[in-house]
Amino acid sequence: MVNTMCLNLTIPKKCFYWLFILWALFGFSITNGESFDDNPLSRINNYIEYSSIFSSSGQVSSDDLNNIMKSGVKRIIYLAYSDQDRSLLNEDRLVKNLGMQYIHIPVEWSNPETDDFLLFAAVMQQNPSMPTLLHCQVNFRASVFSFLYRVIYLEVDIKKAKSDMDIIWRPNETWTKFIFQILEMNNINPACDECTW
């Protein structure tokens, strides 16, 4: 708490001390790191960048699409239904008009299916080096698909991939069962040190 004497400017040394503390706590992180303004993609709901060519997020806006295109993304894959309240009207047309590829794989929230993931993986494998944003409404579906794709196809360590997914959410019973099912199909054990399912 700032000393009230500092506010009256009667003890300048303490003022400088408190200003330095505030700068160290708040200003240093803003000036020495990438701020929100440096990367407009970081404003997208639950945006996470896994590599320079693969990221996932929640619902994007039309303004976000311009920034996504400018960042070098060439393909957008959408995993939710287009009739949801927060869906972007005409997202497919907007994306295509910006010169990016658009793929829509509607995944039922309460019943994700193996074929949904297999279709997604097939799309990714057609051109694995194409910069891609995978998104849904809040990055729950997308973060699970990202986790699975990274573990199965990119051979990312389960602990690392799960840690990234846990930043967004800890999958509920339905989605954990889905994860285990897909991993089992690929002969991958979901166990890892420090992994809690």
Region annotations inferred by a language model:
Residues 6, 30-132, 144-197:
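Cys-dependent protein tyrosine phosphatase-like superfamily
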Residues 135:
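Short, surface-exposed ligand- or partner-binding patches at beta-edge/loop junctions that are enriched
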Residues 139:
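Substrate/cofactor-recognition hotspot
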Residues 4-19:
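Bacterial N-terminal signal peptides that target proteins for export
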Residues 12, 27-31:
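Intrinsic disorder/low-complexity segments in short proteins, especially the signal peptide
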Residues 17-27:
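Bacterial N-terminal signal peptides
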